[in-house]
């Protein structure tokens, strides 16, 4: 959670300076780097470092996505779009323990049989047998890669923020 405190304001400044798409891309890139690092180097210090990197990216995503929800459906549909986003997050929080349980079960050295499932075979090849839970980091890495490609290929219109949404709107930070 310290990463949120550290990155939220700088992410807002980056949005003001560079726009939404680069910050959104970077917001997915940082967790991609964090999950890849831990999936490859599964030590406790790397877990701490990768969790912090993932947190920085998630703070960036929250900072850029919340205002984009207002743009997606228009001001009049903002509440609906925000609720749909929360619904999707709720589905993910419901499904993730099921995916985790499935991966732990299928990658158990006593149960795993090569050749039954291509995806499980792939994960078995890159996940240590004694740490099957690391496979979830590989799944997250794959999902983040898909999001990076999607954001990279997407076209973003120029989005004007509401005056109150911009850091520049506050006189507290402006030199006198």
Give residue ranges: language-model regions:
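MFS-fold secondary transporters
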Residues: 34-38, 54
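Intracellular juxtamembrane helix-capping segments at the cytosolic ends
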Residues: 60-74
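C-terminal membrane-cytosol helix-exit motif in multi-pass small-molecule transporters
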Residues: 100-109, 118, 122, 128, ...
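Hydrophobic core of transmembrane alpha-helices in multi-pass small-molecule transporters
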Residues: 46-61
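Central cavity-lining transmembrane alpha-helices of secondary-active solute carriers
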Residues: 1-13
């Amino acid at each position: 959670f310290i990463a949120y405190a550290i990155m939220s304001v700088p992410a807002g400044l980056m949005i003001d300076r560079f726009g939404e798409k680069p910050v959104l891309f970077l917001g997915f890139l940082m967790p991609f780097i964090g999950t890849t690092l831990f999936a490859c180097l599964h030590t406790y210090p790397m877990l701490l470092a990768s969790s912090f990197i993932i947190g920085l990216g998630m703070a960036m995503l929250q900072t850029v996505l919340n205002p984009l929800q207002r743009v997606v459906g228009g001001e009049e549909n903002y509440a609906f779009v925000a609720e749909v986003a929360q619904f999707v997050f709720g589905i993910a929080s419901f499904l993730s323990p099921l995916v985790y349980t499935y991966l732990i079960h299928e990658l158990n050295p006593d149960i795993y049989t090569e050749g039954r499932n291509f995806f499980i075979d792939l994960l078995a090849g890159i996940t240590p047998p004694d740490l099957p839970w690391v496979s979830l980091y590989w799944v997250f890495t794959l999902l983040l890669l898909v999001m990076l490609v999607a954001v990279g290929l997407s076209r973003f219109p120029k989005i004007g923020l509401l005056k109150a949404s911009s850091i520049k709107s506050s006189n507290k930070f402006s030199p006198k």
